[in-house]
Curated annotation (Swiss-Prot):
Name recorded for this polypeptide: D-aminoacyl-tRNA deacylase
Any one GO BP annotation for this protein: D-amino acid catabolic process
Provenance organism: Pseudomonas putida (strain GB-1)
Molecular function terms, GO-annotated: D-tyrosyl-tRNA(Tyr) deacylase activity; Gly-tRNA(Ala) deacylase activity; Ser(Gly)-tRNA(Ala) hydrolase activity; tRNA binding
Taxon lineage: Bacteria, Pseudomonadati, Pseudomonadota, Gammaproteobacteria, Pseudomonadales
Subunit structure: Homodimer.
Length: 145
């Protein structure tokens, strides 16, 4: 399971012109599920997202987590993050999970996030989405479980 974490001042996701998820300060995370993933990887990713210290403290040092600052968490499924780009001029998606497994594990991740954190939003799995964000820093990390 991969998560592209971006620290944001605000972000929203639209589907067909309708806002389906939005946060103020927090983390926008693009999530890709891979064929061998399970709930264990989803649990590990969520733990890291909630506790990874990417927000600045009073001294300007990245020392605070999403939980510490009470920020929002916007989860967006994006199977293209699992692409194999090593060969040729076209990405291969054979390294992405089948849609049924992807949907199951993304929904599980979202359910667990809602149970463990107050401010959680998401896009729609498999939908054509427009993601708007104000990247803060920019601060971006690729997490792989």
């Amino acid at each position: 399971m991969r998560g592209l974490l971006q620290r944001v001042r605000g972000a929203r996701v639209e589907v067909a012109g309708e806002v389906v998820g939005a946060i103020d300060q927090g983390l926008l995370v693009l999530v890709a599920v891979e064929p061998e993933d399970s709930r264990e990887q989803a649990d590990k990713l969520l733990h890291k997202l909630l506790n990874y210290r990417v927000f600045s403290d009073e001294q300007g040092k990245m020392n605070l987590s999403l939980k510490d600052v009470g920020g929002g968490l916007l989860l967006v499924s994006q199977f293209t993050l699992a692409a194999d780009t090593r060969n040729g001029m076209r990405p291969s998606f054979s390294t992405a999970a089948p849609p049924a497994l992807g949907a199951e594990l993304f929904d599980y991740l979202l359910q667990q996030a809602n149970a463990q954190h107050a401010d959680v939003a998401s896009g729609r799995f498999g939908a054509d989405m427009q993601v708007h964000l104000v990247n803060d820093g920019p601060v971006t990390f690729m997490l792989q479980m």
